Regions:
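Short, basic-rich loop-to-helix N-cap that marks the start of a DNA-contacting helix
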Residues: 43-60
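Short, charged recognition helix plus adjacent turn
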Residues: 60, 67-88
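Short coil turns linking two alpha-helices in DNA-binding domains
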Residues: 20, 31-34, 51, 65
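Residues in the recognition helix of alpha-helical DNA-binding motifs
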Residues: 13, 27, 37-38, 72
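Recognition helix of helix-turn-helix/homeodomain-like DNA-binding domains
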Residues: 29-48
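A short, Lys/Arg-rich alpha-helix, primarily the initiator
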Residues: 1-26
Length: 88
């Protein structure tokens, strides 16, 4: 699993629910800035991964299963693979 895939899946889940990422965060009981691009990496450039608790909250808030979230991740992985192939 790649960092970018998880974050893309979260952004996709927000979009699929007609929400900005801040709206998904609020719906999930999280701070509105939780999914800001600026929070996807630490100051030193190290990737910041969303916690299991955060993922659990967005799954519950959007009423999907963990399997559905995994499917979204798989679709985002495929998109990323295609983008990388085209970019070569």
């Amino acid at each position: 699993m790649k960092h970018k895939i998880i974050w893309n899946a979260i952004e996709r889940l927000a979009k699929d629910n007609n929400l900005p990422c801040s709206g998904l965060a609020k719906l999930s009981g999280l701070d509105a800035t939780t999914f800001n691009k600026s929070k996807q990496f630490f100051a030193d450039g190290t990737p910041r991964w969303p916690s299991c608790s955060t993922i659990s909250k967005i799954i519950a808030a959007t009423n999907i299963s963990i399997e559905h979230f995994a499917e979204i991740c798989a679709q985002e992985k495929q998109k990323l693979s295609i983008e990388n192939t085209i970019g070569q």
